[in-house]
Amino acid sequence: MQALTNPFPIGSSSLIHCMTNEISCEMLANGILALGCKPVMADDPREVLDFTKQSQALFINLGHLSAEKEKAIRMAALYANQSSLPMVVDAVGVTTSSIRKSLVKDLLDYRPTVLKGNMSEIRSLVGLKHHGVGVDASAKDQETEDLLQVLKDWCQTYPGMSFLVTGPKDLIVSENQVAVLENGCAELDWITGTGDLVGALTAVFLSQGKTGFEASCLAVSYLNIAAEKIVVQGMGLEEFRYQVLNQLSLLRRDENWLDTIKGEVYE
């Protein structure tokens, strides 16, 4: 895609603060390391600002929310807003939890650089009909035409913010650009945490000076292309998980990986 430039090699080993869930934190940490940056996970309100102030990007994931974690998230998001720290918010579970949906809407006031979610989560957040259950998207929610128009309107309300919507076709929407991307494989749904990983990789690319739109396109494409390189015939879940992380560390050596992105960018 001509709109994107290769972010590798990573120019500086940025510290990425991930406020995420206990299920996927190891995968996120290893994924960030595979790209050449450093992860830290701190969600105790007593220390959260110490780590956020040292970081070059903040990733907030709402999985496994608690009252204490919510307090820490609000503290970190406020600091990110006041200090212009790039921030990604992953709206996990807003289709089911009114607490999470309310929190995400509050976090919009802190102007995250990227707001991420699956098709059902984002449809729920912007007030469209959805069929999401738990933290999973529904196959019934993959219609993009109505969602795209609403997101364009939201981008005018929240200038400078990009939306990253994951699905069979990934949507990235900003004030002036829309990308529809088509890389990936169904096997990524075999293991938990791959959606969370996209958010963490987005934070990595933000830490390198990419815009929200660029970082979102790079992150979702990088993971999807890495997964496409894996031969999955006869492969079990644990082997596939291992190979995903393995390919994340190898793909950055390919100077032409951007040429394998499938999709279009529209102005």
From Swiss-Prot:
Would the keyword Ligase be found if you checked this record's keyword annotation?
A: no
Residues involved in ATP binding:
116, 166
* InterPro entries documented for this protein: Hyethyz_kinase (IPR000417), Ribokinase-like (IPR029056)
Which cofactor is essential here? Mg(2+)
Q: CDD domains from the xrefs?
A: THZ_kinase
- Annotated residues for binding of substrate: 41, 193
A GO MF annotation of the entry reads: ATP binding
Which Gene3D superfamilies does this UniProt record tie to the protein? Answer: 3.40.1190.20
Record GO biological process: thiamine biosynthetic process; thiamine diphosphate biosynthetic process
| Enzyme Commission number | 2.7.1.50
Keywords annotated in UniProt: ATP-binding, Kinase, Magnesium, Metal-binding, Nucleotide-binding, Thiamine biosynthesis, Transferase
- Its recorded name reads Hydroxyethylthiazole kinase 2
State the species of origin.
Streptococcus pneumoniae (strain ATCC 700669 / Spain 23F-1)
By which gene is this protein encoded?
Answer: thiM2
